[in-house]
């Protein structure tokens, strides 16, 4: 028998009741089977479509096989590095149902990133897409805790298909509790070292009942499509938590979300809800193949990851007649806690708090700011907050302060009560919605034979979106020029995830520094 949560939406915020024995995967799947949606399509991916019944069987087989075939125990961890498609929800939910903790990770990283995450998490199993296997194959035997490498989309005895074939279609959910560890996501840190962000079973349904139903207005008959991938907290809600919470259908796309790829899915599947990020919205509007008004049937669009430029929002609304509901969420809070909403969209702001979450702004002295127009660090209190960073007590203590979670973002509240983004509290950059450490990019640049010193800052492009810009001091004997710029960009792309490379490189004689030798990035940002 399924153990389901119940939400009463006659109140604001809704009253959410979660039983003492509770498994998030059991809830998200079981509610749809009990509601008679077994024959309804839940996912459409690049290979075909799948019903709720088919998903339930795949999840049971996966949970059963992880526990019995591979011998995983409750709270053991499995790394999930899988391109968007049916294999992601199969593995993610299958692990959760079995009491195993899945760790969804970015599919765009490097071999060294993956080695760090495998070592840090001590995951016993990694499930990876066939396309990513060359990056993971060297890990077997190199990372001592890794026992099994399972290939999604592959063939043979190590494939996910072969593993599922060993599992049972009848599988009872592990007797987990709402506050048991459920899954991890990795969040970047100020030094570039990722942090394992630990979420519990009750977090998923809270995001659906507090944001997706009342703010976004998602409903059973909707088809939804998220350009943000499932390994992001934003994408996980968009393409997995929210559609399953209401019985909707989600479109999944494995390839990179270029304007052309997104246009094709929008035209073919005609989603009711589209989830994007500012960089993509700007690129789509600038593309000559952008759909015309009346070509799509969009009812709602959302944006997160970075602040949506006001001009982009207004141009999108003018073209399609539908607003973009810009908001802010985080890996730590799992999804959006501050948002514009239908009928109350103020472009250039992140809107107002989602009911069920409390926000405060704190100044540099630790005092709460109550005056409009004064910027401070945004802190959040809400039921979907992560409980810790794995194996990182210092940063856990610095971020999770009792009921409050620090965002690292600076905000101000304008005279009308809407929250306006005012930058990062540290030097971290948000590039296409993904945090980038300038220190990591600087280290890669300095590894080039021509570079003596490097400093990286955030710089606005023509759409007012932030991208990395590098200021370079060359070693004696090297000359500045376009050929070297091109070589440096390629060098960074070769060492780091491609989105981290500097879009602009400026050669300078020296870098501004403090008396103690610390680079003064604020002077470069205003240069």
Curated annotation (Swiss-Prot):
Quaternary structure and interacting proteins, as annotated: Monomer.
Keywords: ATP-binding, Ligase, Nucleotide-binding
EC number: 6.2.1.25
InterPro entries on file: AMP-bd_C, AMP-bd_C_sf, AMP-dep_synth/lig_dom, Benz_CoA_lig
Function: Catalyzes the ligation of benzoate and CoA to form benzoyl-CoA at the expense of ATP. The enzyme also ligates 2-aminobenzoate and CoA. The enzyme shows activity toward a number of benzoate derivatives.
Family assignment from sequence similarity: Belongs to the ATP-dependent AMP-binding enzyme family. Benzoate-CoA ligase subfamily.
Biological process according to GO: secondary metabolite biosynthetic process
Top-rank taxon, per record: Bacteria
Keyword Acyltransferase: no
Protein name stated in the entry: Benzoate--CoA ligase
Reactions it catalyzes: benzoate + ATP + CoA = benzoyl-CoA + AMP + diphosphate
Induction remark: By benzoate and 2-aminobenzoate.
Gene3D superfamilies: 3.30.300.30, 3.40.50.12820, 3.40.50.980, Luciferase, Domain 3 (2.30.38.10)
Keyword S-adenosyl-L-methionine: no
pH dependence: Optimum pH is 8.5.
Gene Ontology MF terms in the entry: ATP binding; benzoate-CoA ligase activity
């Amino acid at each position: 028998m399924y153990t389901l949560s119940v939400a009463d939406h006659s109140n604001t915020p809704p009253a959410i009741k979660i039983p003492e024995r509770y498994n998030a995967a059991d809830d998200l799947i079981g509610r749809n089977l009990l509601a008679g949606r077994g024959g309804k399509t839940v996912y459409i991916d690049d290979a075909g479509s799948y019903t709720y019944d088919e998903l339930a069987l795949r999840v049971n087989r996966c949970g059963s096989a992880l526990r019995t075939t591979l011998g995983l125990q409750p709270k053991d961890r499995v790394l999930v590095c899988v391109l968007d498609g049916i294999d992601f929800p199969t593995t993610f939910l299958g692990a959760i149902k079995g009491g195993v903790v899945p760790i969804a990770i970015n599919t765009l990283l490097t071999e060294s990133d993956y080695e760090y995450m495998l070592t840090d998490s001590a995951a016993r199993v990694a499930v990876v897409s066939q396309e990513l296997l060359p990056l993971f194959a060297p890990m077997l035997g190199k990372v001592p805790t890794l026992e099994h490498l399972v290939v999604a989309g592959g063939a043979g005895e190590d494939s996910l298909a072969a593993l599922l074939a060993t599992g049972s279609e009848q599988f009872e959910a592990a007797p987990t509790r709402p506050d048991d560890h459920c899954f991890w996501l990795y969040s970047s840190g100020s030094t570039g070292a990722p942090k394992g962000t630990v979420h519990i079973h009750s977090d998923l349904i809270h995001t659906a009942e507090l944001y997706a139903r009342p703010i976004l207005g998602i409903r059973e008959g909707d088809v939804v499509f998220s350009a943000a991938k499932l390994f992001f907290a934003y994408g996980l809600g968009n393409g997995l938590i929210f559609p399953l919470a209401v019985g909707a259908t989600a479109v999944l796309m494995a390839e990179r979300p270029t304007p052309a790829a997104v246009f094709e899915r929008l035209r073919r599947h005609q989603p009711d809800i589209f989830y994007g990020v500012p960089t993509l919205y700007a690129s789509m509007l600038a593309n000559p193949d952008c759909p015309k008004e009346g070509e799509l049937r969009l009812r709602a669009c959302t944006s997160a990851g970075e602040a949506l430029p006001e001009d982009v929002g207004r141009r999108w609304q003018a073209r399609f007649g539908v607003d973009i509901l810009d908001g802010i969420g985080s890996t730590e809070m799992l999804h959006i806690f501050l948002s514009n909403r239908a009928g109350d969209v103020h472009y250039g702001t992140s809107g107002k708090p989602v009911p069920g979450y409390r926000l405060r702004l704190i100044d540099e002295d630790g005092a709460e700011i109550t005056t409009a127009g004064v910027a401070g660090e945004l802190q959040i209190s809400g039921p979907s907050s992560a409980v810790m960073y794995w194996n990182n007590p210092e940063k856990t203590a610095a971020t999770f302060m009792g009921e409050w979670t620090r965002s690292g973002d600076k905000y101000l509240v304008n005279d009308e009560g809407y929250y306006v983004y005012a930058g990062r509290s540290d030097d971290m950059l948000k590039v296409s919605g993904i945090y980038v450490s300038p220190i990591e990019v600087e280290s890669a640049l300095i590894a080039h034979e021509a570079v003596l010193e490097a400093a990286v800052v955030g710089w606005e492009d023509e759409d007012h979106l932030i991208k990395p810009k590098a200021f370079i001091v060359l070693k004696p004997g090297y000359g500045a020029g376009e050929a070297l710029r091109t070589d440096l960009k390629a060098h960074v792309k070769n060492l780091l995830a491609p989105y981290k490379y500097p879009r602009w490189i400026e050669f300078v004689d020296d870098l501004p520094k403090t008396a103690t030798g610390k680079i003064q990035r604020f002077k470069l940002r205003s240069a």
